[in-house]
Amino acid sequence: MKLPYLPPALFISLVLQAGPVRAATAEYEIEIRDHLFYPSELTIPSGVKVKLRVINTDETAEEFESFELNREKVIRGGKTGIVFIGPLKAGEYPFFGEFYPKTAQGKIIVVDDN
């Protein structure tokens, strides 16, 4: 089978329009309210990159921190921070608020989606 001739400019424009294929990023939200995380447990599927939107409704700053996730993010009062995590293996990944560690605690629960 013979392919039709495409002028180089047309060929290049078609290739550039196609662009790279990217996997969708799952999005979840956690709210900081009264120095607590809501929800305190968040279940996500394994093997997926996650965009975690952390909304701090308190007037004071808080830091989303997790040693297991290797993440730290200070979120000023009344602001929203974005934390990317994953892809992760099944398991539990605790996180806490560094400024109020006795109350601001939670965990990401990663489950196999099979």
What are these regions (language model features)?
Residues 31-35, 47, 55, 67-69, ...:
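Generic beta-structure capping elements
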Residues 1-5:
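Positively charged n-region of N-terminal signal peptides that target proteins for export
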Residues 40-59, 80-88, 94-96:
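Beta-strand cores of secreted/periplasmic/IMS beta-sandwich domains, seen most often
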Residues 19-23:
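Sec/Tat signal peptide C-region and signal peptidase I cleavage site
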Residues 44, 64, 112-114:
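Extracytoplasmic/periplasmic soluble domains downstream of a signal peptide or transmembrane helix
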Residues 7-17:
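Bacterial N-terminal signal peptides
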Residues 24-29, 36, 76-114:
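Extracellular/periplasmic metallocenter environments
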